[in-house]
Amino acid sequence: MILTVTLNPAIDVSYPLNELKCDTVNRVVDVTKTPGGKGLNVSRVLNDFGETVKATGCIGGESGDFIINHLPDSILSRFYKISGDTRTCIAILHEGNQTEILEKGPLLSVDEIDGFTHHFKYLLNDVDVVTLSGSLPAGMPDDYYQKLIKIANLNGKKTVLDCSGNALEAVLKGDSKPTVIKPNLEELSQLLGKEMTKDFEALKEVLQDELFEGIEWIIVSLGADGVFAKHKDTFYNVDIPKIKIVSAVGSGDSTVAGIASGLANDEDDRALLTKANVLGMLNAQEKTTGHVNMANYDKLYQSIKVKEV
C-alpha cells in the first residue's frame, strides 16, 4: 500500500473566460471544482493505475468535507481534522493564459501539528511507500518533512519527497534522508545557487555533491526532454517521445505516482523510470489534473528509452 501525504490541500476552482476584464464583472458559466493539492493528484493517479492508496493530510471546515466527499471511494481517506478551513485555489483561464489566485491556507496550532504527527505514525502500519508532496501549511516548521521522513525511516518505509524551497533545503541538511527526491531544473538551480541546464556532465557532477549524500534516488525533471536520474552510483537519461499536450498541470505529481508504484513493487531501475515517465505523459494528455487514461499506457511505455550515461 502507498500512503500519500498532502499537508496543505485545497479545493481547486477553475474559471474559464473568453476574456478577463479588470475592474468590472466577469460572469462564469462552466465552473470546475476538484480536490486539489499535489499529494491528492498522486492519489488519484495511483488509484487509476490500480494501486491501493491511502490519503492523509490536514483538512478543516466545509472545504475539507468537500475534499473527502469528492475523492474516489476506492481511495482510503485518512485525513486529520483541524479547526481552520482548508484553502481554495482559483485558476482563471483566459485568452490562452492561466492566472492563479492561491490562498495561503489555515494556521495550524502546535497541538494540531503534534496531533498529525501521531496520526501519521498510526497510518504507517500497513504501508510500503510514503509520498510527501507540496507546501507546508502556516505554523508548521520548515523541517517538518524531515520529522515525518525520520519516522518513516525508523519504521522501514520508503519515502518520495516532492517539495521545494525551505522545506526541501531543511530535509537535505537534516540527518534523515528520503529514498527519492524529484526536483526540476529550476528547483535544482535554486538549491545550488547557480543556473543548471540539460548538460549531462554538469548534472552528474552536481548530483554527487555532499548536499545529496544519503539519498538513494535523485530524479531531475527536464520537462519535454524527459528525465536525468541518479540511482546510487548509476546515472540515467530518459528520452521521451513528443506528444500532444492538453495540460501539463499535475504531470510532475503523476510522475511521483509512478515512482512510488515502482518502489512499492520492487521494480528495477529501467522499469521504475519508464513507468514514472509514462504516467507523467498520460496526465499531460488529459484535461483533468491527476488523471490518466490507461488505454494509452502500453504504447507510450514502448516508446520510452532509458539509457545509462
Curated annotation (Swiss-Prot):
It holds the Pfam family PfkB. Keywords: ATP-binding, Kinase, Lactose metabolism, Nucleotide-binding, Transferase. GO terms for cellular component: cytosol. Disulfide bonds: none annotated. Pathway: Carbohydrate metabolism; D-tagatose 6-phosphate degradation; D-glyceraldehyde 3-phosphate and glycerone phosphate from D-tagatose 6-phosphate: step 1/2. One of its GO terms (biological process) is D-tagatose 6-phosphate catabolic process. It comes from the Bacteria. Its EC number is 2.7.1.144. GO terms for molecular function: ATP binding; phosphofructokinase activity; tagatose-6-phosphate kinase activity. It catalyses: D-tagatofuranose 6-phosphate + ATP = D-tagatofuranose 1,6-bisphosphate + ADP + H(+). CDD domains: FruK_PfkB_like (cd01164). Belongs to the carbohydrate kinase PfkB family. LacC subfamily. This is Tagatose-6-phosphate kinase. It comes from Streptococcus pyogenes serotype M28 (strain MGAS6180). The lineage of its organism: Bacteria, Bacillati, Bacillota, Bacilli, Lactobacillales.
